[in-house]
Amino acid sequence: MAFKIIASQCTQCGACEFECPSNAIELKGEKYVIDPKKCTECKGVFEIQQCASVCPMPKTCVPA
């Protein structure tokens, strides 16, 4: 299962985009989105999902 970004909570800071090891996050229009085909939930790379760990807004990057 991939992660998703709750658009209404996202501040568009961009921290998640730069931390994603699979380059699954990009800015589309005025919101960041996670490509579910690219998202690996950081498995095999990190113990926790990097998007969720760097996001300044709690529970904005969540399981899809």
From Swiss-Prot:
Record has Ligase as a keyword: no
Any one of the GO BP annotations: nitrogen fixation
Positions contributing to [4Fe-4S] cluster 1 binding: 10, 13, 16, 55
Lineage: Bacteria, Pseudomonadati, Pseudomonadota, Alphaproteobacteria, Hyphomicrobiales
Keywords for the protein's UniProt record, in alphabetical order: 4Fe-4S, Electron transport, Iron, Iron-sulfur, Metal-binding, Nitrogen fixation, Plasmid, Repeat, Transport
Residues binding [4Fe-4S] cluster 2, per UniProt: 20, 39, 42, 51
Name of the protein in its database record: Ferredoxin-like protein in nif region
Cofactor note: Binds 2 [4Fe-4S] clusters.
Record Pfam families: Fer4_7
Residue span, 4Fe-4S ferredoxin-type domain: 2-30
Organism: Sinorhizobium fredii (strain NBRC 101917 / NGR234)
GO molecular function: 4 iron, 4 sulfur cluster binding; metal ion binding
